[in-house]
Amino acid sequence: FRGLAKLLKIGLKSFARVLKKVLPKAAKAGKALAKSLADENAIRQQNQ
């Protein structure tokens, strides 16, 4: 059981490291997506 806990800790640490690398990219992609959606909405409203 102790070995399992150790493995879990190591897994969580590496997972956190991956998250730290991925999160900023995901946040940037999310912002870009939100902006393009907002732009599309604005264009649609102008066309009406």
UniProtKB/Swiss-Prot annotation:
Record function comment: Disrupts cell membranes, particularly those rich in phosphocholine, through formation of pores. Has antimicrobial activity, hemolytic activity and insecticidal activity.
Swiss-Prot/TrEMBL keywords: Antibiotic, Antimicrobial, Cytolysis, Hemolysis, Membrane, Secreted, Target cell membrane, Target membrane, Toxin
Name this protein carries in UniProt: M-oxotoxin-Ot1b
Record-level Gene Ontology MF annotations: toxin activity
Location(s), subcellular: Secreted; Target cell membrane
Gene Ontology biological process terms, A to Z: defense response to bacterium; killing of cells of another organism
Keyword Metal-binding attributed: no
GO CC terms in record: extracellular region; membrane; other organism cell membrane
Organism: Oxyopes takobius
KW Membrane (keyword) present: yes
Superkingdom in the source lineage: Eukaryota
Similarity comment: family membership: Belongs to the cationic peptide 02 (oxyopinin-2) family.
Predominant subcellular localization, coarse grouping: secreted
